[in-house]
Amino acid sequence: MSGVKYEVAKFNGDNGFSTWQRRMRDLLIQQGLHKVLDVDSKKPDTMKAEDWADLDERAASAIRLHLSDDVVNNIIDEDTARGIWTRLESLYMSKTLTNKLYLKKQLYALHMSEGTNFLSHLNVFNGLITQLANLGVKIEEEDKAILLLNSLPSSYDNLATTILHGKTTIELKDVTSALLLNEKMRKKPENQGQALITEGRGRSYQRSSNNYGRSGARGKSKNRSKSRVRNCYNCNQPGHFKRDCPNPRKGKGETSGQKNDDNTAAMVQNNDNVVLFINEEEECMHLSGPESEWVVDTAASHHATPVRDLFCRYVAGDFGTVKMGNTSYSKIAGIGDICIKTNVGCTLVLKDVRHVPDLRMNLISGIALDRDGYESYFANQKWRLTKGSLVIAKGVARGTLYRTNAEICQGELNAAQDEISVDLWHKRMGHMSEKGLQILAKKSLISYAKGTTVKPCDYCLFGKQHRVSFQTSSERKLNILDLVYSDVCGPMEIESMGGNKYFVTFIDDASRKLWVYILKTKDQVFQVFQKFHALVERETGRKLKRLRSDNGGEYTSREFEEYCSSHGIRHEKTVPGTPQHNGVAERMNRTIVEKVRSMLRMAKLPKSFWGEAVQTACYLINRSPSVPLAFEIPERVWTNKEVSYSHLKVFGCRAFAHVPKEQRTKLDDKSIPCIFIGYGDEEFGYRLWDPVKKKVIRSRDVVFRESEVRTAADMSEKVKNGIIPNFVTIPSTSNNPTSAESTTDEVSEQGEQPGEVIEQGEQLDEGVEEVEHPTQGEEQHQPLRRSERPRVESRRYPSTEYVLISDDREPESLKEVLSHPEKNQLMKAMQEEMESLQKNGTYKLVELPKGKRPLKCKWVFKLKKDGDCKLVRYKARLVVKGFEQKKGIDFDEIFSPVVKMTSIRTILSLAASLDLEVEQLDVKTAFLHGDLEEEIYMEQPEGFEVAGKKHMVCKLNKSLYGLKQAPRQWYMKFDSFMKSQTYLKTYSDPCVYFKRFSENNFIILLLYVDDMLIVGKDKGLIAKLKGDLSKSFDMKDLGPAQQILGMKIVRERTSRKLWLSQEKYIERVLERFNMKNAKPVSTPLAGHLKLSKKMCPTTVEEKGNMAKVPYSSAVGSLMYAMVCTRPDIAHAVGVVSRFLENPGKEHWEAVKWILRYLRGTTGDCLCFGGSDPILKGYTDADMAGDIDNRKSSTGYLFTFSGGAISWQSKLQKCVALSTTEAEYIAATETGKEMIWLKRFLQELGLHQKEYVVYCDSQSAIDLSKNSMYHARTKHIDVRYHWIREMVDDESLKVLKISTNENPADMLTKVVPRNKFELCKELVGMHSN
């Protein structure tokens, strides 16, 4: 080893000190001189002082010899090795904030230019990372990886997409290895032959050799030989162009194909559709049989095959020609679909495949797959096809082509396939007749063994046996929408899952296409007809001419007739007693009911599933041959498009739905057992019933057991009885039943008809109903308005599944009260309200003066519950419709304060610490006590009009609920009363009243509209105040406070502790958004959720999908919990609130993450007491935490008597240029809150020696005391220097605290679980 010489370059003072220092230390280690460099190094006892001094001199000499002259001059006065080493570190590795900021800026701004050597760029990147690490700056592995990828030029975008695909986390070593491998491959010589090339409109383009990224990443270089020799397009000879060719011009059909050095043969359709190019001589000879091997080409616009037998659906015809490399032409003999089973076991349906007999291989088009929603990835000589998170197929590169193996099968939508028999098709098609199945088979729409017949089906007899009908002739209209038949069927003996009892049909005479709307009551027919009318006219562009129906009251209303007349629709009503005139609709009702009866019987499902069965039956009828159409398919006649049958399944069979990995853990089941009950909004999608969770789910990744049906044990007793807890059931109010089955013998033979179903939900507001799912096959037409109830799951986001929750619904009108189960109690509440109005002299009946207008009024009902969600009171209130008021006439000032939530927590914490009494009161009809200053008239209350005086109006003497000035008038009345009792109103909070009787005896009153809290030590004085209040106002004494504004109050007087909890509220929120059974998480926001505006939807489709997600409602619900008792979610709620205007899928995932956190911490509450009532403040900031505008976050938190009383987490209004500035701004905001709390407590007679705000930034603390760092702080807005004045006059102090002990840290950023739990403990949050 002694003979080895080590070289270390001299350090010249430029960048790279960290690398030089590392190498220099290694050199000293090799020479045995490193011991003198350590800070705590001491001379060993066994070594002489002379030897130690010699060792130090040799080390110092070695260091100086490896420094340039300029650097040596800077350390000339240092004699020892340790002194030189330390001086160099202070000069060239400064750990100041400025040096850190400089290196960070270099790292974040680092960008590799096109053509730059990647290894050089990687060395610079790693050098910056190392220097920052030496300065104590820790950068997470994921951040390092993302920074490296972001520093690469745009030519690396596809590679970056491939590296990040399917990963939730990534490390720098993964990115580095992939990039180094890519660098090696870039240096390989380019392939001379190109795999597949595209040609269109006489021009061909060569695909780029870069196979990284998705299929869309193709080069656009024109297809030319590597050499620049070009042949004439006319005679195919070199040396001249076509325009100069001496030979006669060839005709269009005789043009020679250009033959380049790659031996490429072109296939081009005459209609300019791009197909593909293949290397004919080299590649085709190496392929196995076309049934087993396929070639993948991302430049082809259509799939192609030479084998006719592969098609499961085929249409022969003249679809153009294909030009081959030998100048011959081959026709496209037909187009159809091919179903293949890929090498990973999935079923893939290739649509619109071109049949070209002269081809030598099967070809898969990447563009066609992309149009169908699949994604192709090419990397490392491998190909992978995915859809969502599911891998569909894989392939490898052999030669210059990507190939994959597949087997031919009958397409079944990614589902397990049994041997298809005629009996199975009979069940799939909803018990279709054998004749209908034969017609579909002749049309090659379905397939089964020839010569087989349908076995006798008992379920058909149970559901469809009827008398033989008389034959009548029927003349069908030639044009669609010339005539539409309609009829109502019902009521059913049991309500559907959605609470419906009727359905109405609309049938187009020309196409025999059917629409069915499921209803709660028959009076909804007019509304669904309006929807139907708008739907079909917009879809077809034609006008509806005639409507034929019976004389039912639902069709003969005045509004129905006026609507038809205004739109030019001739409404034909049948003669009473002659249903034959509307035989098409009558027969259709029978067909639907027969199918439903047979399907439910075979599936062994309860009758409450009749709505789902109707939907499925109509979906199948849409695709069944119709006798009046000469056995044509109504759906095809209506849309003029082919109909697919490959995805059909047996209604009620067992099914196993795949659970996405985002909704399960590694050990959870990957599928859930369900019952198949219908088809979704798209062709490839299913509706399934989950008998465990009692809800309907949608999925496209399903495995079916069509030979198995559910047993009675699969369903709960509630489902058997038709009661589905996930849906609100509203009883029908119609008393006019319609026959569920026509008993008429002489009806036109309609056959099985097509259908669409839109199921009607519960009534939300007067005249507004919720419309559920239309099942119309491939094309869906959603209702033209948005619903006002929580939406059903977005089709794109299965994780946002929502169904209605059964709950006690409050009546919204007097009409609903009369049919409400609690009618008597609600009527009693109304009577009590009227008596209170009369007792208070609220109004008197007068004649309406000329020029005046009366305001309208309505009844509002409330079923009040306690903290445990138990019904405790029925409340009815007469409310004026104040939105009709006009400013300057009916009102002037309207502002009215309410007590601050911070004041409530402060007073409750004081009560816990001093063991004070806390009593609660409620003012009955509080707003009725306010005196009006304006002259206002109102109509008489509904249900309480005075006989003989109905023309008179109410002149208001007192204010009423609903009036814009009512809150203000009540507050002024109450404030006047408190002043008369010599109570003082605090300036800090005008809804807090205080009166001191002696040094230790006082009363504090908090007012929140009509709710009051009284806090004091003397029960006698409290009782006196209650009595005085009861004399002036109608009060309700609630005794010791147990709940205020939804917060449950629990006290333990012996230990002087008080808890505030919102457990029941949070449980209701979780139930409302279907997260009650979600998997809990440990923190309210995960580190991988980097939310940005770039995640917001940009297309109309994406915005439409997100419009179905209750994002705003969920965030609003979370915000109320945060404001009251949950400071632990303040930061998370603040982040998701930034995207309320246009939320995206990732933002919704973050909201659900917060709900999952609440799911595991439902019982967490704030604890006060157990310590002295001392006010403490904590502040923190997160530098540039907002990804979009790089603004910093401010977080502050105040504790009093051991619990948090005030907190805030929000973005700063300006961009901070340093962490010092961000912390300084946060300290100023915290100081403002501290001064307010200080003043508030002092007004209550509470003083403490000093008021301290704790900050973990020493530089911000220094800046608050002195005007330091002028060059770096001179730009800070003067308003933020307010805190210096407060510190100078000793109004507050700013002191240092360790970051590990600062609870405000959780209000500005995502912190690890252990730190998060510590923060919660420091602010008094405990589990219940």
UniProtKB/Swiss-Prot annotation:
The keyword GTP-binding does not apply. Its EC number is 3.4.23.-, 2.7.7.49. Pfam families: gag_pre-integrs, Pol_BBD, Retrotran_gag_2, rve, RVT_2, zf-CCHC. Residues 473-642 form the Integrase catalytic domain. InterPro entries: DNA/RNA_pol_sf, GAG-pre-integrase_dom, Integrase_cat-core, PolX-like_BBD, Retrotran_Ty1/copia-like, RNaseH-like_sf, RNaseH_sf, RVT_2. Residues 729-742 have a biased composition (Polar residues). Signal peptide: none annotated. Keywords: Aspartyl protease, Endonuclease, Hydrolase, Metal-binding, Nuclease, Nucleotidyltransferase, Protease, RNA-directed DNA polymerase, Transferase, Transposable element, Zinc, Zinc-finger. Residues 217-229 have a biased composition (Basic residues). This is Retrovirus-related Pol polyprotein from transposon TNT 1-94. It comes from Nicotiana tabacum.
